[in-house]
Amino acid sequence: MTDKKYIIALDQGTTSSRAVLLDHNANVVEIAQREFTQIYPRAGWVEHNPMEIWATQSSTLNEVVAKAGITSDEIAAIGITNQRETTIVWEKSTGTPVYNAIVWQCRRTADITDKLKADGHEEYIRNTTGLVVDPYFSGTKVKWILDNVEGAREKAERGELLFGTVDTWLVWKLTQGRVHVTDYTNASRTMLFNIHTKQWDDKMLEILNIPRSMLPEVRNSSEIYGQTNIGGKGGVRIPVAGIAGDQQAALYGHLCVHAGQAKNTYGTGCFMLLHTGNKAITSKNGLLTTIACNAKGEPEYALEGSVFIAGASIQWLRDELKIVHDSFDSEYFAQKVTDSNGVYVVPAFTGLGAPYWDPYARGAIFGLSRGANRNHIVRATLESIAYQTRDVLEAMQSDSGERLQYLRVDGGATNNNFLMQFQADILDVNVERPVVKEVTALGAAYLAGLATGFWKDLDELRDKARVERTFSPDSDNEKRERRYKGWKKAVKRSLEWAKEDEE
């Protein structure tokens, strides 16, 4: 226990930087948020300005302290959570970035990943890093910068450049260039890290021609990395003490720290993580093997899967079909009918991800009869989010042999009670929605608070991780399996839809 009263979580996201101030009971006291510029130099390319990331993030830090009317000596520690994979390379001596940050969504390195596949590296990468070969991850982005920015490779080979994901950049800036670190969760997203030995992988560095001197030191997610001054020179020195990538921070914020515990974040898509304890499981279903935290913030493992289209399908009902005026209306229409009247919506607008991995699948509505109306289509669209979640969780359970204990949930769509109840019904497990919705920030705050003694241990936090509502499954097993079988049939018919057109 400490006389300090607050923890600050810096939540550096893809579209905005936020600072969240939490008290000793893990309540959100104040939030400051600033959006920053999305840069699209060409189709499929996405960049951020690293100096703007830092400017927005540091200003929210000062702003949240000012808004709450507190002094900086009341702050115990700062924790950081961040958009993962986004890649920054800067000069060691000046701290000046040599290029914009290349964002996780950016597809510019597709030709590099194609070559990795053609050269037969796919299996090695999967077995060593836990990842699939895709432009999403940091390694090929670093290579692109070294190959395409004038003078960058020569400087890197002389030891003059540093690489970091966004967490590393923020810690570097917060500590005035004294500390160059990352944590295990972020390192596991680079495609340069051996998740079994927990070391940077020499063979991957050789394949991508990246000098080892650029890489940060990898540390636990809960420890003191350095100090920062709030309010410039002569200000109070505050420990920077927790780091985790956004999805792993959310897993920790839900207190999912043991094998068999899982969370799903419902946003535009869904991000699911299932904790697998000290076992790194190689998926047979195209899921990622990634590093997550145990109770002490030390590295253990998780399986990660994502659904491409979740909340985006409700936006489609609103913006394209115009059958709901507002996303919130979807619950009202869905509950006007007792079932979907045999209608299934497969929202494969951009293909299907895990466990199907079919880029040629396309969206479809099946089972329409003359009696099908707006309510049935809205309901079937919401149901598709729950069905896709079951698809991924079944793949996770078959890979891991872990039986899901319960599902913790966060993200915008969790406010939809119909969807949460249907999710519980179709999974046959309890779905738990927390009181504090800022779960990602909570995870970073917990990691920082435990490192500095603000909280004693995770048991102290369990009382604070309050569940706002538990959705318990309907016990009708026959109905559950009949509905899911219908979904599988609908998916099967939407697969490879666009393929014939290209032949």
UniProtKB/Swiss-Prot annotation:
Pathway annotation from the record: Polyol metabolism; glycerol degradation via glycerol kinase pathway; sn-glycerol 3-phosphate from glycerol: step 1/1
Pfam family, one: FGGY_N
Disulfide bonds: none
Protein keywords: ATP-binding, Glycerol metabolism, Kinase, Nucleotide-binding, Transferase
InterPro entries: ATPase_NBD, Carb_kinase_FGGY, Carb_kinase_FGGY_CS, FGGY_C, FGGY_N, Glycerol_kin
Matching Gene3D superfamilies: 3.30.420.40
GO molecular function: ATP binding; glycerol kinase activity
Annotated residues for binding of sn-glycerol 3-phosphate: T14, R84, E85, Y136, D246
GO biological process: glycerol catabolic process; glycerol metabolic process; glycerol-3-phosphate metabolic process
Residues the entry annotates as binding ATP: T14, T15, S16, T268, G311, Q315, G412
Catalytic reaction list: glycerol + ATP = sn-glycerol 3-phosphate + ADP + H(+)
A Gene Ontology cellular-component term: cytosol
Renumbered residue ranges of the record's region Disordered: 468-489
Comp. bias intervals (Basic and acidic residues): 468-481
CDD domains in the cross-refs: FGGY_EcGK_like
E.C. no: 2.7.1.30
Binding site for ADP: T14, R18, T268, G311, G412, N416
Domain of life: Bacteria
Family, similarity comment: Belongs to the FGGY kinase family.
Record function comment: Key enzyme in the regulation of glycerol uptake and metabolism. Catalyzes the phosphorylation of glycerol to yield sn-glycerol 3-phosphate.
Name of the protein described by the UniProt record: Glycerol kinase
